[in-house]
């Protein structure tokens, strides 16, 4: 009987139990810093790993389009009390080892949402699609809760429920206000107002004649469509960075240029 070759044996013969050479997977990767646009702080708020450029593959192109999520406490100074606010950013450009991002949405933590929901009050939810003056189409979700009037506090009842007609009127007021504000502003200024308390205070003032509200919150923001950002627009979003402050890649050169030089050889 002809004995066949064992495909598991190497040509030169191998010793049983020989150790394989281990390669550190991190040696093939490099770190990139996340940078946030206006209205957030210009400092780095996180890092990500990317496989190094090789062949026709450029690492800086692979990282573009990634969506990252952070809290407002990490993105903005003196905002530790807003750690419940989550911010989504998408990477649009890579400058050296800096991954520059732009606004991509808002959300709140689950524990914050649960802490606002209580008994004996009406929860009002509003949703509207609006367009900023620089071409962003976004969907804004707003939460509001009714509160007792001065007359209700003096009465024995513990509830402060709104009628369905009042809920509809409040919802219309909120949606109209958000739509009008978005049409007047660009995404940088509009996102700044959504994160702050300017809009919630104005909504409370405009709806107090219908029914008093409390705990008005921009619960979520989704970016449905955004324009293509060119170099000029990205420079405007990062005008808060100091001039001349630019991270460098390997050997003091931007990573994209080093990869292109490698391909040209």
Curated annotation (Swiss-Prot):
Residues 1-24, 240-265 are annotated as: Disordered. GO terms for cellular component: cytosolic small ribosomal subunit. The keyword Coiled coil does not apply. GO terms for molecular function: structural constituent of ribosome. PROSITE patterns: RIBOSOMAL_S3AE. It comes from the Eukaryota. HAMAP family: Ribosomal_eS1_euk. This is Small ribosomal subunit protein eS1.
């Amino acid at each position: 009987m002809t004995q066949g070759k064992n495909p598991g044996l190497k040509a030169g013969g191998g010793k049983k139990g020989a150790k394989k050479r281990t390669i550190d997977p991190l040696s093939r990767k490099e770190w990139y810093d996340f940078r946030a646009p206006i209205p957030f702080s210009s400092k780095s708020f996180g890092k990500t790993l990317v496989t190094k450029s090789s062949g026709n593959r450029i690492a800086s192109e692979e990282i573009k389009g990634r969506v990252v999520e952070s809290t407002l406490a990490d993105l903005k100074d003196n905002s530790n009390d807003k750690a419940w606010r989550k911010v989504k950013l998408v990477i649009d450009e890579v400058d050296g080892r800096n991954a520059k991002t732009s606004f991509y949405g808002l959300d709140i933590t689950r524990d914050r949402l649960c802490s606002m929901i209580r008994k004996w009050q009406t929860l009002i939810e509003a949703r509207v699609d609006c367009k900023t003056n620089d071409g962003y189409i976004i969907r804004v979700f707003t939460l509001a809760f009714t509160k007792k009037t001065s007359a209700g506090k003096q009465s024995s009842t513990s509830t402060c429920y709104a009628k369905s007609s009042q809920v509809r009127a409040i919802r219309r007021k909120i949606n109209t206000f958000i739509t009008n504000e978005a049409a007047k502003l660009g995404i940088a200024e509009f996102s700044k107002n959504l994160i702050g308390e300017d809009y919630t205070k104005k909504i409370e003032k405009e709806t107090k004649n219908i029914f008093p509200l409390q705990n008005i919150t921009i619960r979520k923001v989704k970016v449905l469509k955004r324009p293509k950002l060119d170099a000029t627009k990205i420079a405007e979003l990062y005008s808060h960075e100091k001039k001349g402050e630019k991270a460098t890649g390997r050997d003091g050169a931007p990573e994209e240029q080093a990869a292109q030089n490698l391909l040209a050889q």
